[in-house]
Amino acid sequence: MQAIRPARRHHLEIAVLIGALLCTRVTPAAEPQRERPSPRVQQLLTSMSREEKMAVIRGGREPAEAAQSEAGWTAGVPRLHIPDLRFADGPQGVLVRHVSTGMESTLSLASTFSVTDAEANGALIGRDARALGIDVILQPYINIYRDPGFERAYNTLGEDPVLTGTLAAHIVRGAQSSGVMAQAKHYVAYDGGENALVDGQALREIYAAPFRDVSDAGVASIMCSYNQINGVYSCGNGATLDGILRGEIGFKGFVTSDWGAAHGAEFITQGMDMEQPGTGPGAYFALGKEPDEPPATKEAEDDLQAAMTTGAPEEQRYPLPKYAGPPIPPVPGVSRNLGEALARGTVTDADIDRAAGRVLTQRERFGWLDHAPSHKVVAQDIAGNARIVQRLSERGTVLLKNEGILPFSRADLDSLALIGPGAQQTFAIVTGQEQSFGRADREIGAWQALRAMTHSDGLRLAVADDMTGVPVPPAAFAQLTRALTLRGASAITGAASDINQTIRSHAMLPAGASAKWNGTLLVPADGDYEINMQLLGATGRFWIDGRSIGNMGWWGGHGDIVFANRDNVIPTTDGLDNVRRLVKLTAGPHTLRVEANADSSGAPVQVRLAWVTPPMKERAFAEAVETARSAKAAVVFAWSRNRPWFGLPGEQDRLIEAVAAVNPNTVVVLNTGEAVAMPWLGEVRAVLEMWYTGDEGGWTAANLLIGKANPAGRLPITWPRRLEDGVATDPAHAERASSNTEGKAHYSEGIHVGYRWFDHEKIEPLFPFGFGLSYTTFSYSRLSVHSALDGGLDVTFRVRNMGKRGGDEVVQAYVGAPDPAPEGVQFASRALAAFDRVTIPAGTTRAVTLHVPPQRLRYWSLADSTWHDARAGRSVYVGGSSRDLPLSARFAH
């Protein structure tokens, strides 16, 4: 599912209805070989009415008294003991109305280069899902990191299909071993643009390859994507669904549409088995026209636009995308629902049976035809989950630079400045999209963690950018009134002195309360003010001079409960949700309106209007620099949500440069979703990329900074020197970008994505794919390559830990192009073929064998549309990154 479409449940249903009126007939693809359902499933299909079959292949609305605000639901058939199913969003974690584990980001997990860690991640997600009464998790996300401008690039497992597919397969195994179905997404080429124009070799070798791995791992379901592939919508693309996914790859599970990605009833003939959300007038997998629903109000549309395009104050100076909603398919003629398609003969009952049979087969496989999966919400293993998240976050951290300053010694801690909001609070979630909102009560910063671990009095904190602010004081309000409505009572209106009703102010409102404030805000001077609406236990909105400034919890797609991490980069320091907006105000009076309406959590209602004035911002920045000046060493915590592309928002670059100018022992800790420019790299002594850490990031940072953990994460993406160096951001190839005005992304680079592009074009990256430092060093020797029994290769070598500290090395094997290479076929000069993460004690040597499966030695020929073996005449390269490969051997046979 797609982050920029959070209102899909209502808005997509309206949009898809429009699309249904514009459709053409879909031409069925050739029927691939299919496995027959089991006798039990066949008997069920015989016993089911057409309407009952529809119930298992079409989303619906779970009764309100039972719903967990999950992403989707199918009703089942109680008469035949076929249970209903719940689907929950991700990655990462499990997104429902209940609090659940906040996990490290997917790029952080990818940076572990560890199948053990991937399986642990999947198992944790699976256990949380079962505890929350969820049956199907909408993850792993296995598209390829191709274009940093694509809105979901941060959700990937990196730029390489082998890394992505290998880790994803183990996520699936971990999750499904916990008793939930995994649904890998988004098939296919959902990597940039509404229409991916990609050739058959790149499509199979790069973009479909991870789906082969999860299929081999037994994934229960795959989600087809919003985009078109070569002009045909993914969920109705018989060539990619029935042709590649089922025919070539051999996938045996069921295919579900992304929410609103079906554009015709005939998609059921092309390989799509289940429609989601499946409700409303735009539902295609319905036997007739569904009842109309009230159209979205202008206020709701404005809220959607604001939520999708308004960033935090640090981000608002940069151009943000205009949310245009889902693409409307210009394809007139396709049936508006299955009832119409059956009458026209474009769909048959056999098509419905086939789709229902695939879904029922997976239910049978998971034992859900013998008994219903439990939908009871039970206690999660909070402490156990926290230990796993902390370990994975530590193992996914990448040390990009270290000039001998890390790890800090005990003496360093006697005078250490910790600077930035990330020093006080961990950047656990940051994005607030299709993932668990985490446990804000566990999310302490590195400053608190280091104090607890070391008991040092020399740790100094300066946030530099105060994201909480201070309550707007009573003196800044005039004629302020509050209308308070308690549950079941009439509103009581009276004068108010401020808007500060929280636990901290000892004035919180009772559960179920709603309140409206109206009055005048008195602004002391012209300037850019950060105005923050802070809530818990309620949804809210606020206006200045009649203009909507911010809202929180307005979208009920995953329930109305407001979590502390729901609408912000980080919560307030006292654990409230925090909608921060930068507002240019003139000195004098401004009309103000604030509303808070109790959510369904049953929690007391807390409401606060806070601000950060221009003088406050200047003072905080100056205090941070002075704190750094007086310390022996300084650590600056910086963050980004890819707004702007390839940069740190706000004044963070200036802050790092100012701190480094007064303290030569400056370390930077990054919490970013993707690569960022580092104009200050030469001025600092160390850089740690921690990505988004999950709930335990403060402890992670502390352990890494003082050496209780040894960083060994490796980059799953190439870190460019310039944004323009990337394959989809090259100004000479504007047609490749997901943001181009045509809506078409031309994958004209073929297979040369990520590090393959940098190698092909001989571009020097800032940090190469697979790169990462450690607090020790390693050497490689004695490479040998032999044929394996399965037709692949076994690559054996030795790795020695040259230092005085034990550590992990990520060993990587790449294969070169055949020599001679077949004419008309693309090959990477080096392509990752195998990897492992190995632990080596100080001063010892370890023998390592990596296996290269035969599929990674094959290529797809566009000339004859066939896979070919290409083992002979290829070199194998081994080392610690795509640009550090000290060992090589040629395999001749």
Pin down the residues of each PLM region.
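Bacterial N-terminal signal peptides
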Residues: 13-24
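Bacterial N-terminal signal peptides that target proteins for export
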Residues: 2-15
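Glycoside hydrolase catalytic-domain context in secreted enzymes
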Residues: 30-860, 866-883
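Short beta-strand elements
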Residues: 884-893
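Sec/Tat signal peptide C-region and signal peptidase I cleavage site
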Residues: 25-29
